[in-house]
A protein has these predicted regions:
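Conserved catalytic core of nucleotide polymerization and phosphodiester-bond processing enzymes
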Residues: 1-196
Length: 196
């Protein structure tokens, strides 16, 4: 959490860990590894230096590893896991492997993060920004992964920037209210402008 609040460049950090383990890696190339452990990837099948990063990630973010184990326990005991919004994912054929982990451990680690982000937060943000754009000529025309594409009328550029800034300030509070959770991770919206 501290790194998020301080704006740490996590991709540069990943690059540093892999490079110091003996494999020079650019910040751009390191991006493929930065969040992979969060979504279930391991050091298995990686180079020795890349595997060092995955092991380092688990040691540094022990809370995430503990959460993954909690998800595994829930899936094994109940046959499902839940996202913070209450969306459930069933694992009817789950089994425990010899190493103690569930048979679908990667999916178990991936679903709560990806689902909450792409099935809940992104659409929620889209609807909120659409509401803030009401009465304007500018409009949302598409969403791609975690990005919203807004067709901005030239006369409304500053207004749309203000809408994004307002959404940025309110989003966490609205998420907490919507799902009655303590969502204490800042969501920082970037605003990039280009010709169409």
């Amino acid at each position: 959490m501290k790194e998020i609040l301080e704006g740490t460049d996590v991709h540069a950090y990943t690059s540093k860990v892999i490079t110091e383990a003996g494999q020079p890696t650019s910040r751009q190339d390191a991006k493929a590894h930065t969040f992979a452990p969060l979504f279930g990837a391991t050091g298995y099948g990686r180079t020795q230096a890349e595997a060092a990063y995955y092991h380092h990630f688990i040691a540094k973010y022990a809370g995430i590893a503990a959460w993954h184990q909690s998800l595994a326990k829930s899936a094994l005991n109940k046959g499902f896991i839940s996202t913070p919004s209450g969306r459930q994912f069933a694992f009817p054929n789950i089994t425990r492997r010899r190493n103690g982990n569930p048979s679908e451990f990667t999916r178990i680690k991936n679903y709560p993060v990806q689902s909450f982000a792409t099935a809940d937060i992104v659409p929620f943000t889209l609807l909120y920004i659409e509401h803030l754009l009401k009465g304007m000529q500018s409009c949302i025309v598409n969403s791609v992964h975690d990005s919203l594409v807004i067709d901005v009328h030239p006369d409304e550029l500053e207004q749309v920037k203000y809408v994004i800034k307002r959404a940025n300030k309110s989003l966490v509070t609205l998420i907490n209210k919507q799902w009655d959770i303590d969502f204490n991770v800042p969501l920082l919206l970037e605003c990039k402008i280009g010709p169409n």
